[in-house]
Amino acid sequence: VIGRVSSADKVAIAKEAGADHVIVDTKGQFGQEVLRLSGGDGVHVVYDGSGPKTFPGSLDSLRRSGTFCWYGPVLGGPGPLDIMSLPKSIKIGYAVFFDHVHTPALLHARSSQLFDWITSEKLKVRIGGIYPLAEAAQAHADMESRATTGKLLLIP
């Protein structure tokens, strides 16, 4: 697992979450380092929720027939794509939460599985901050500034 973070203070968090290697990058130019770490082949799959700046680096990181999973981009989408110019026969998907829980039964089953994983500590949830509900604007500003890691909780 190769992780990409935007600042050195997030390296330990990425390693704690299971990354074998962590690249610190703020310009979206991490593709060459991923290729080096993967022996020149690239990776099988990239999960990218950052935004348009990381899109080219994510594409460059993939091996032939790799999969690019774009999800919840915090900083906007990549803009129009010319699918004829995509390299290496890659596959691109955009994950939308509601498509995976579109029935009450699916929502119940997947939430139960999620909470089982949390309870058994198979999945660890990192709490990045706790804010009174009256400070929701500050929580949003902190998240938008990318200074936080983990989940932010609002307490009524």
Locations of regions flagged by a protein language model:
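Short catalytic-loop micro-motif centered on adjacent basic/acidic residues
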Residues: 42-47, 67-70, 125-128
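A structural signal for short, well-ordered beta-strand elements
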Residues: 23, 79, 129-132
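C-terminal capping/lid region of NAD(P)-dependent oxidoreductase domains
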Residues: 122-130, 137-156
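Adenosine-nucleotide cofactor-binding segment
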Residues: 1-54, 103
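General small-molecule cofactor/ligand-binding pocket signal
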Residues: 23, 91-93, 126
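Glycine-rich phosphate-binding loop and adjacent beta-alpha segment
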Residues: 5, 14, 53-122, 155-156
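Short conserved AdoMet
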Residues: 39, 63, 87, 147-148
